[in-house]
């Protein structure tokens, strides 16, 4: 009787160990995926920042060209 109880206990302990091992493997996979996603987010943020800077530069260039065009148009009106 005690031997059967011991075998059942041993089986439950082994099952718990197997479950823990699987969960640890899943945790490692999720950590790797999380790291990968974090890198993707960082890259996306860097790309966004670059695009914002480029957009600002293009807006400034557009303003310069608009001022030049206004100047030329005002000179044409004077003629």
Curated annotation (Swiss-Prot):
Ranges in a coiled coil: 4-78
Keywords: Cell cycle, Cell division, Coiled coil, Cytoplasm, Septation
A Pfam family the protein falls into: ZapB
Superkingdom in the source lineage: Bacteria
GO BP terms, alphabetized: division septum assembly; FtsZ-dependent cytokinesis
Family per record: Belongs to the ZapB family.
Its job: Non-essential, abundant cell division factor that is required for proper Z-ring formation. It is recruited early to the divisome by direct interaction with FtsZ, stimulating Z-ring assembly and thereby promoting cell division earlier in the cell cycle. Its recruitment to the Z-ring requires functional FtsA or ZipA.
Subunit structure comment from the entry: Homodimer. The ends of the coiled-coil dimer bind to each other, forming polymers. Interacts with FtsZ.
Protein name: Cell division protein ZapB
Organism: Sodalis glossinidius (strain morsitans)
